[in-house]
Structures are given as structure tokens and as C-alpha cells.
């Protein structure tokens, strides 16, 4: 199995943080369980300097995982490198043989371009959120992957969080009644736009980068259709720092269920939390129904750590946590699961020579869930949140007017 990972930043390797990211630890855990005889991960970064920093992270993660590389063929390679300082992911796509799949973790504004090129080379592709920024681009990608009979997924890992699965179970059981509203508060530390994403933060906004998770989640829980959107944003602190993007955005989405019941979702998102906040992300969701409500504080998960060396910490043990098992490190959580289920699905497909099968003899949904987890997000489903983002961005540019979703 040969995996191409395009992008080598914080989420892939933990570069710029004291962690090892989420994507590569997920790949480690996938191989630890499956012990595939020939297993290779190719990392494609933007420049030689970044790839060198990420390479150190990758090699250290492998070392502390204590995977016996003499028994498991686990090869990693990095581009650009000393011999090929100008080589990019485009060269790898063109020249590398027998790639199994691609994982795309690049800045938001590059998603369409990179995903499109992966599909051009017939690769099952997993992309981090958001899927795309424009609906027309989402439609093009969906059409292409269907024509080529390959799979495309977007890594909306909040669908795998047991907090949110409990919300879905409560909603589906109808014990909370008909939906009236969802209220979401979601924020991250200033270090994210100011340092970690400084080179491209001005090309996105906090709703696209972060809030989209909970737009997708409301669709996942209710299967409702977004009808119209209103968004208001504030530019202050980041603009003074030379980063021309919104500090905070408030967004109202009107949804309609299959039973023609309308409800609203209100999101308040920002990425200017103090850097000494007790967690990287502060996140809460509340559902109000005609028979009851559901509240989930997804930052305060019952753990606080205080030491002389650090401020108070409230870690999230459910997302992606490194645990010591004897002398080795293992990573567990719904963030890990969201990626390993994609790799498991690709392996099933490859073992069954899926591309040459009668793809359209069954419904696309049945075929999708034969290989992937029920919580997985197809390109088709991810296009729902893209439509909301596009309308929200139009609202921001037009005096925060309501924008209908087409």
C-alpha cells in the first residue's frame, strides 16, 4: 500500500507544536494493526525547509511508536529533498507508480486544485475540511470522481466524536421532538492565525476553516437542507497584526427537514482566544427541540491538569491523544478513527479490484458504506457545507444580507 500525503504542516506532522499532528499518527496506528507487507508513505511539502522540519517530526513519531521496522516494511520518503529540491506533489503524481490513495491537507484555498489533480490520477482521495469554497468546484469534483469510479471523502472528524453520536442518537429517536435551534460556540487560540497559519490565514476565514465542522455536523444529525444564510464578521485584532481576515464571525443558517420543519443554527466562531486558554479549541453545542434539549461542552471533558511548568490544561482525551503503552506510544481517538477508516476502506477496495467492478449496479450510498464508516463524509455530503460557506461569504460581502442557498 502506497499513500501520498500532500501537505506536511501542523495537522499532518504537528510541525510548529509539541505534538505529532493527527494524520501521520493515524497512519502509524493503521499499519500497527494491519501489518501490511509493503507499506510506504510519501510526504509532499511546499518547500525544502518545511519538509525538513516535518521529517524530524515523522521520524521521531516512528521512533516512539516502537513499531518494529525490521518486521514491518514501513517506508517513508519526503519531497522536496536534497536531491530533488524542486520536486512537488505534481511530479509525484506524474511519476510515482502504484499509488493507492492520497490524503490532502493543504491550505483551504488550494483544496480544489490539489484534489482535482489527485482525481486526474485516479486516486481515492481524503481531504481535510473544508471540501471546497465554491459550489461549482464541488460539483466538478463530484462529477469527476463518479466518472472515474473512485471515492472521495472529506475528513469531518466531529462526526466520529461520541458526544455528537449521542446527539444524533437522541435526535433520531425523536425523544427531543422536532428541531427548533442549534447554538454553536467554537474558537481557537490566536497562535493559529498569527503563527501556525500566518502565510495563508488571510486567504480564508474562521467560518471556513473551523465553523464548517458544525455546519456539517448539523447536516449529519438532521439530514436537513440549508435554505438561507446570514453572516456578520468583525476585523480588529488580526488586521492590526497585518493579517486581513475576520477575528470573529456570527452566522445564522435556516434549515428545512424532510418533513418541511424549519429550524435555525447559530454559530459564533473566532480564532483570537488567548494563547493561555486551557485548550486549543473551545467548543460547545446546544440543541433545542419541542420535547427537550441536548447540551455538550466539548472542551470541558472532565479533565484538568495543573503543574508548576504549565498553566491549567483541559486536554481532550477523545480526539487524538498519545498514550504510553509500556515503552511505546500509541495514538487513539475519533481524529485517528476518521483517517484510519478511510485507509481501511481503500485497502478493501484495492483487495477487491473495485475499479473494475460493476460500480453502478447498486446505489452509490450502499456501495459507499460497504467500504467506509457510517460517519464518513462523501464528497456529495461535504458539498452541503460548501454551499453554506459560499452563501455566508456572499452575505459578508453584502452588508450581511440573507443569502438563499441555490
Residue ranges of predicted features:
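Beta-strand-loop-alpha-helix segment that lines the small-molecule cofactor/substrate pocket
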Residues: 101, 107-159
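Short, well-ordered amphipathic alpha-helices
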Residues: 22-32, 55-60, 165-171, 251-254, ...
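N-terminal glycine-/serine-/threonine-rich beta1-alpha1-beta2 phosphate-ribose binding loop
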Residues: 1-121
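Active-site loop of classical SDR/Rossmann-like NAD(P)-dependent oxidoreductases
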Residues: 49-54, 329-340, 357-360, 380-384
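Contiguous beta-strand/loop segments that form the cofactor/metal-binding neighborhood of enzyme cores
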Residues: 209-310, 325-352, 364-369, 389-393, ...
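Glycine- and charged-residue-rich phosphate/anionic-cofactor binding loop of Rossmann-like
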Residues: 352-384, 404
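Short, well-ordered coil/turn segments that N-cap beta-strands
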Residues: 123, 150-151, 178-180, 261-265
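Predominantly a Rossmann-like dinucleotide-binding segment in NAD(P)-dependent oxidoreductases
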Residues: 9, 153, 158-244, 251, ...
Amino acid at each position: 500500500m502506497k499513500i501520498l500525503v500532500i501537505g506536511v504542516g501542523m495537522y499532518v506532522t504537528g510541525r510548529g507544536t509539541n505534538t505529532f499532528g493527527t494524520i501521520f499518527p493515524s497512519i502509524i496506528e493503521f499499519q500497527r494493526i494491519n501489518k501490511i507487507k509493503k507499506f510506504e508513505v510519501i510526504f509532499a511539502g511546499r518547500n525544502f525547509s518545511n519538509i525538513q522540519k516535518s521529517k524530524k517530526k515523522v521520524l521521531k513519531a516512528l521512533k516512539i511508536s516502537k513499531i518494529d521496522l525490521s518486521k514491518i516494511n514501513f517506508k517513508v520518503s519526503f519531497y522536496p529533498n536534497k536531491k530533488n529540491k524542486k520536486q512537488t506533489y505534481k511530479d509525484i503524481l506524474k511519476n510515482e507508480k502504484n499509488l493507492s490513495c492520497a490524503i490532502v491537507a493543504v491550505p483551504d484555498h488550494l483544496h480544489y486544485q490539489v484534489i482535482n489533480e489527485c482525481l486526474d490520477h485516479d486516486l481515492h482521495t481524503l481531504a481535510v475540511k473544508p471540501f471546497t469554497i465554491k459550489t461549482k468546484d464541488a460539483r466538478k469534483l463530484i462529477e469527476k470522481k463518479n466518472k472515474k469510479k473512485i471515492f472521495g471523502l472529506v475528513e469531518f472528524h466531529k462526526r466520529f466524536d461520541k458526544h455528537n453520536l449521542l446527539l444524533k442518537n437522541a435526535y433520531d429517536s425523536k425523544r427531543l421532538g422536532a428541531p427548533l435551534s442549534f447554538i454553536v460556540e467554537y474558537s481557537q487560540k490566536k497562535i493559529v492565525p498569527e503563527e501556525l497559519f500566518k502565510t495563508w490565514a488571510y486567504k480564508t476565514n474562521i467560518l471556513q476553516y473551523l465553523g464548517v465542522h458544525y455546519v456539517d455536523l448539523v447536516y449529519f444529525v438532521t439530514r436537513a437542507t440549508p435554505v438561507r444564510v446570514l453572516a456578520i464578521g468583525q476585523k480588529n485584532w488580526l488586521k492590526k497584526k497585518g493579517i486581513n481576515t475576520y477575528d470573529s464571525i456570527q452566522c445564522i443558517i435556516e434549515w428545512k427537514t424532510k418533513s418541511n420543519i424549519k429550524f435555525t443554527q447559530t454559530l459564533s466562531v473566532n480564532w483570537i482566544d488567548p494563547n493561555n486558554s486551557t485548550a486549543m479549541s473551545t467548543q460547545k453545542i446546544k440543541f433545542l427541540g419541542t420535547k427537550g434539549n441536548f447540551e455538550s461542552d466539548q472542551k470541558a471533558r472532565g479533565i484538568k491538569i495543573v503543574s508548576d511548568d504549565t498553566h491549567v490544561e483541559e486536554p481532550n482525551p477523545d480526539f487524538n491523544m498519545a498514550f504510553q503503552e509500556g515503552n511505546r506510544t500509541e495514538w487513539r481517538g475519533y481524529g485517528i478513527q476518521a483517517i484510519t477508516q478511510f485507509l481501511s476502506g481503500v485497502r478493501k477496495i484495492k483487495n477487491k479490484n473495485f475499479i473494475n467492478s460493476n460500480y453502478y449496479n447498486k446505489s452509490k450510498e450502499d456501495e459507499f458504506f460497504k467500504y467506509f464508516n457510517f460517519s464518513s463524509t462523501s464528497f456529495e455530503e461535504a458539498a452541503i457545507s460548501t454551499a453554506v460557506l459560499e452563501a455566508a461569504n456572499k452575505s459578508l460581502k453584502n452588508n450581511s444580507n440573507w443569502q438563499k442557498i441555490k
